[in-house]
Every structure is written in structure tokens, then in C-alpha cells.
């Protein structure tokens, strides 16, 4: 079985190709939109994805050394995400499905992150931290779905950091040589400022931290502000995670999503693992950010259980939560 996956939920347009035997991942091509200034504008994302989609598709097929006729199923991320960006991927997936008579597999973007985590870390029954620009979720699989134990009450951890570095003119670009610019800035700081720390049960709030940090710009060293924002945000996350570990008694902690690439977070999680006698499983950097391979792999799992969608019903779902998705392949 060969499955082609299309990812276009935010700033990255990606196409991945997988098969149902090792090595599972045959191709993982992508192109990421980097704004010259400001944040991501939906219209700019649409234009970028539309311009690069054909090239990325061709590169993926060439990398996998197969033709479109060899593909069994087309998997596509229908949400959550930014509407115009989602539509580019959905439109391409529908066109391929219709032209080549292929079945269409609907994939939740977050489930893609989680499933590629299972594959690459070999986790079996973990508590999961899903950390990205748009999501901050503590979850685990239970009775047919991924159940959310904790999440952000406002903006996501990754988004908070992106907005902060953009507002203080450190970005774009947000990532330099694989390192987020807040980490680069924070490594030069050492003073922990008094900024909001908000954890409610296993939920977190990052908006107050962002607002307060921006208010002290010009009054404190920027390096110390970066250091404080990073340390406080990560410590909030770790407190909520410890509570979830105590509740679930899990012996594995799997971290997926773009923020999983943070070296400083990795160090904190390794210490947490030692304290709680928990194995830390972190998705490799290649699969931490948005990518088509994770959509293809999750799509292959779904297709194996007959999860398909008619082309005329393949609507995008910008607010599609991971706990709304039935997971028959894990029952």
C-alpha cells in the first residue's frame, strides 16, 4: 500500500509518501512560507501554497521513485488550521482523487503529529505533549480517542513565543539553524523577571505572560526578558505535565509538534523524566514541524480501517480538535 499525504494547515506546504512496510517513509518534501515582516496573513499563505504545490508534489513522487498511478490513497489534512491555507491542500487532494480515481482519507493535523511520534519514537502507551504554533495539549489515548487532560486556555505556547520575538523585532525569521530565536536570545540572559505564571489544574494561560513581557521591553535587558519568558512558559508546561503524570501513572512521555525541537525544553523534560522515572520520547526534528509524511502515515492507519471521505463531503475544518476524532486503528 502506498499513501500520499498533503499538509497545508499553516505556513508549510508538504507532501509525504509512505508505504505499509519498512522503511515506511519514502518521501517528505515541503516548502515553508516565511513572511518578510509581521505574522502569517491568510492571503499570503494561499498564494505561497498554490505556487509551490505542483513542485512539492513532483519532488515527493521523484524522491519515492513511484508514479501517481502507484498511489493507493490520498490523505489530506482537513484541519485544524488557517482556512485559505487548508483549501489549497484540500483542493489538490480532491483533484488528484477525482482525476486518478483514488479514495480520499481525511486526517486531523494533530493526529498526524501524534501518529508520526508513535512511529519515530516507538512509544507504546505515553502521555503526550502536543506543542506547536497553534496547539498546546496534554493528551493520551483512551477508549477509542485521544483524551485531552490539559491545554492552553488562550494562545498556544509556540504562537506566544513567535508573537513575542516578532514584536521585539527579533523575527522573522523565527528559526535560525534549527534554533528558535527566543532560545538564541535567552541564552544571553540570566535574570528571572517577575512575570505572570498561570496554571489552572492541567490547563495553562500564556496571554498574560506575553502582555507583561512586552510591557517591560525597554525597562529590562531584552536577553533577560527572553530568558524569563522561555523559563516561565516551560515551567508552566512542566507543572501541568507533572499533574497529568500523577493522574495517569504513565511511564512514557512523548513530545510532538514544532516546539519539541527546542533543546532547552528537552533538557527540562529529561530532568522531569529522571524525577518521575518516566521515559522521555521526543519526535526527531525532521518530523517535529509540519510535514506531509505525518499526514500520509496517519492516513495509512486510517485507510487500513476503512476511514474514507467522499470528495464532495471533504470540507475543511479549521477548528477540528484531536479529541473529536475516532481512532479505530488503536482499539
UniProtKB/Swiss-Prot annotation:
Cofactor list: Fe(2+)
EC category name: transferase
Catalysed transformations (reactions): L-threonylcarbamoyladenylate + adenosine(37) in tRNA = N(6)-L-threonylcarbamoyladenosine(37) in tRNA + AMP + H(+)
Recorded GO CC terms: cytoplasm; EKC/KEOPS complex
Main localization of the protein described in the UniProt heading: cytoplasm
List of residues binding substrate: 130-134, 162, 183, 262
Claim: Flavoprotein is one of the keywords in the record: no
InterPro entries the UniProt entry points to: ATPase_NBD, Gcp-like_dom, KAE1/TsaD, Kae1_archaea_euk
Function: Required for the formation of a threonylcarbamoyl group on adenosine at position 37 (t(6)A37) in tRNAs that read codons beginning with adenine. Is probably involved in the transfer of the threonylcarbamoyl moiety of threonylcarbamoyl-AMP (TC-AMP) to the N6 group of A37.
Protein name: tRNA N6-adenosine threonylcarbamoyltransferase
Gene: kae1
Amino acid at each position: 500500500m502506498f499513501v500520499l499525504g498533503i499538509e497545508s494547515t499553516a505556513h508549510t506546504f508538504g507532501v509525504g509518501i509512505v508505504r505499509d512496510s519498512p522503511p515506511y517513509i519514502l518521501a517528505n518534501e515541503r516548502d515553508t512560507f516565511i513572511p518578510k515582516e509581521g505574522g502569517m496573513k491568510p492571503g499570503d499563505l494561499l498564494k505561497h501554497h498554490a505556487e509551490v504545490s505542483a513542485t512539492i508534489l513532483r519532488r515527493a513522487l521523484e524522491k519515492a521513485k513511484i508514479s501517481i498511478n502507484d498511489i493507493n490513497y490520498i490523505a489530506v489534512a482537513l484541519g485544524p488550521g488557517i482556512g485559505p491555507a487548508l483549501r489549497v491542500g484540500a483542493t489538490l487532494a480532491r483533484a488528484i482523487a477525482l482525476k486518478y480515481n483514488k479514495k480520499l482519507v481525511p486526517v486531523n493535523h494533530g493526529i498526524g503529529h501524534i501518529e508520526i511520534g508513535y512511529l519515530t519514537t516507538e512509544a507504546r502507551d505515553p502521555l503526550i505533549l502536543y506543542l506547536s504554533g497553534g496547539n498546546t495539549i496534554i493528551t493520551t489515548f483512551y477508549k477509542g480517542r485521544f483524551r485531552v487532560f490539559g491545554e492552553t486556555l488562550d494562545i498556544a505556547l509556540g504562537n506566544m513565543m513567535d508573537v513575542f520575538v516578532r514584536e521585539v523585532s527579533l523575527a522573522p525569521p523565527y528559526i535560525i539553524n534549527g534554533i528558535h530565536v527566543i532560545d538564541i536570545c535567552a541564552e544571553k540572559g540570566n535574570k528571572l523577571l517577575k512575570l505572570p505564571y498561570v496554571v489552572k489544574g492541567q490547563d495553562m494561560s500564556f496571554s498574560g505572560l506575553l502582555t507583561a513581557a512586552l510591557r517591560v521591553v525597554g525597562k529590562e535587558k531584552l536577553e533577560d526578558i527572553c530568558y524569563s519568558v522561555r523559563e516561565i512558559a516551560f515551567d508552566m508546561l512542566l507543572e501541568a505535565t507533572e499533574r497529568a503524570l500523577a493522574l495517569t501513572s504513565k511511564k512514557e512521555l512523548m513530545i510532538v509538534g514544532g516546539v519539541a525541537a527546542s533543546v532547552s525544553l528537552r533538557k527540562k523534560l529529561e530532568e522531569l523524566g529522571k524525577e518521575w522515572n518516566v521515559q522521555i520520547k521526543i519526535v526527531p526534528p525532521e518530523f517535529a514541524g509540519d510535514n506531509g509524511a505525518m499526514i500520509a502515515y496517519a492516513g495509512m492507519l486510517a485507510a487500513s480501517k476503512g476511514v474514507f471521505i467522499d470528495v464532495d463531503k471533504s470540507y475543511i475544518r479549521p477548528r477540528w480538535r484531536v479529541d473529536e476524532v475516532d481512532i479505530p486503528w488503536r482499539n
